[in-house]
Amino acid sequence: KRYIWLAQKFRSLGWDNADIARQSPFQIVDPGFNAILIRSSLALAELADALDEAEVASQSRAFADKALGSMESLWSEALGQYLCYDRVAKTLVQSPSIGGLLAVFAPVPQQRVEEIAQTIRKLAEQTNYLVASHPPSAPEFDELRYWRGPVWLIVNYMIAVGLRDAGQTDLVQRIVD
C-alpha cells in the first residue's frame, strides 16, 4: 500500500528528483546504500587510475572519504551497528536492520568491522542462517519478507565480501555455509 502511494506520488511529480527529495515523506539515509555507493566510488577511482584519469580518481576518492566520515554519525553504540537516519524526523531510526550491517561493504574503520562482526555473531545464536534482515527476536522481523525476514542473498553476499576484505574470514565462512 505504502509503496503504491509513493509510486503514484513520484509519478505526479514527473519523476523529478529535486521535487521528490523535497516532497517525499520517505527520506531515509541508509548506511547500506551508502556503503554500496562508497565502494563503487572507490572502484571508479581505481578504474580512473588505470585509464590515467587522475582528476576523476581524485574526485571519486574525495567523495568516498567524505562519505565514510559522514557514516560515523549513523553509528549506534547500543546496537553495535549503523542505523538509518530519517531526514524528515531528524533522528536515527532505532531499528537493527541489515542495512546497518551492510556498511562493512565499505572500508569502515576496523573497530566498526569488529563490532558489526560481534553483532552478527549474536544474530547467529538466534537463527540457523546468516544474515537475517532483522534479528528474529526484533518486533520488526517478518519471516515472509526479505527486507525484514530471515535472509537476503545479495545483501548477505556483500556483507560477506566486506567482512572478508576486513579479515573476518571465520565469520564469512559461517555466512556462506
Listing of model-derived features with the role each one plays in the protein:
Residues 1-29, 66-151, 177:
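Extended glycan-interaction surfaces of carbohydrate-active proteins
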Residues 10-56:
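Extended amphipathic secondary-structure runs
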Residues 30-45, 95-107, 149-165:
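Well-ordered alpha-helical segments within folded domains of soluble proteins
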Residues 38, 62-65, 69:
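Generic structural signal for well-ordered, non-transmembrane alpha-helical segments
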Residues 45-65, 107-121, 163-176:
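Structural helix-adjacent loops and short alpha-helical linkers that scaffold large soluble proteins
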